[in-house]
Amino acid sequence: MSLTRRIPLPAFAGATVVLFTIAISMIFFYAPDDPNQGLSQRIFYFHVPIALTAYASFGWGAWKALLHLWKRSETADLESYVAIHQGVIFGSLTLLTGSIWAKISWGTWWVWGDDELVLFLVLFLFYCAYFMLRYSVEPGMARANMCAVYALFGVVLIPISFLAIRISRSIIHPEVFTLNGPQMTGSQFLTFCVAFVAMLSLFVTLYQTELAGKRIDSRIKELRELIA
């Protein structure tokens, strides 16, 4: 991730704060109310960017897993782990915000007949199981290889989950983006874009923060082994 290595972490954190301030202001003071859902529709500007960021996190984790298998890189293995960890966090927030939105708008927390919901849950649980695999095997190249293969298998679920909304024609998940363009007003689309960029910036900030922490922890362990 060469771009993030060139930009200091505090700069990313500062940009994230600024972007979120702008996004929240636009969500509550710029974007118009939905005629059918009213104020509750504003959850959309949080829920969908969070979900897309979760997809991006899992995808980035799979890409780093592929790089590990190709180059046998411990760094790529660590980056894959951190990306998937962030994906699980954003996945949890996706399920939480989606359930709240569904309860307010449609009177139910969950609909098992909705393909998008169920497939995202399967994707989420699949990557949760990644950590069960990782912590059940001794650290080393064998564990890194197994986790990388597992992460790559999971990436197949991402387009299936993403495209489910276009296949199922769900009422709970109306199709917002079509071949004819976004099905929203200009101000709504601009607000959505700013919120999405803010969420991606948050992911990069958390990703780099966790990576830095893991690297420091690894160096401390190496020093302890040398001293011992």
What residue ranges belong to the model's regions?
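Polytopic transmembrane helical bundles with strong interfacial aromatic enrichment
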Residues: 1-228
